């Protein structure tokens, strides 16, 4: 994928293509070969890195970490057989709905 700007659906399609047609030595192939547990570990690591980066004023570092997390979540989605359209449908189903904020437990500041 060589576009200067990648869309999330295009990246998803690229990852899905790599799953179907592995390229030896590619990181995506490595993740699929290692399986779900490795992919989950990477999603967890990247989530933590996003949180840490968000606490700092360095926007480029935060952007990099969000991009890494997005990539790994898309790999997880492909591994699980979940499509971008399914996520978009779920998000659309929430549009205009009343918040259940009152039902959620209060988040205390640390």
From Swiss-Prot:
It catalyses: 1-(5-phospho-beta-D-ribosyl)-ATP + H2O = 1-(5-phospho-beta-D-ribosyl)-5'-AMP + diphosphate + H(+). One of its GO terms (cellular component) is cytoplasm. It comes from the Bacteria. Pathway: Amino-acid biosynthesis; L-histidine biosynthesis; L-histidine from 5-phospho-alpha-D-ribose 1-diphosphate: step 2/9. Gene3D superfamilies: MazG-like (1.10.287.1080). It is found in: Cytoplasm. InterPro entries: HisE, PRib-ATP_PPHydrolase-like. GO terms for molecular function: ATP binding; phosphoribosyl-ATP diphosphatase activity. Pfam families: PRA-PH (PF01503). Its EC number is 3.6.1.31. One of its GO terms (biological process) is L-histidine biosynthetic process. Keywords: Amino-acid biosynthesis, ATP-binding, Cytoplasm, Histidine biosynthesis, Hydrolase, Nucleotide-binding. Transmembrane segments: none annotated. CDD domains: NTP-PPase_HisIE_like. Belongs to the PRA-PH family. This is Phosphoribosyl-ATP pyrophosphatase. It comes from Lacticaseibacillus casei (strain BL23) (Lactobacillus casei). The gene is hisE.
């Amino acid at each position: 994928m060589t576009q200067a700007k990648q869309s999330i659906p295009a990246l998803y399609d690229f990852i899905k293509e790599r799953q179907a047609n592995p390229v030896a030595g590619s990181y995506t192939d490595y993740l699929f070969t290692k399986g779900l547990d490795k992919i989950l570990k990477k999603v967890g690591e990247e989530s933590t890195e996003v949180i840490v980066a968000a606490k700092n004023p360095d926007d480029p570092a935060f952007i990099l970490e969000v991009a890494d997390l997005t990539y790994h979540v898309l790999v997880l989605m492909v591994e699980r057989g979940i499509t971008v359209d399914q996520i978009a449908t779920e998000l659309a189903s929430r549009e205009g709905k009343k918040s259940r904020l009152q039902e959620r437990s209060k988040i205390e500041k640390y």
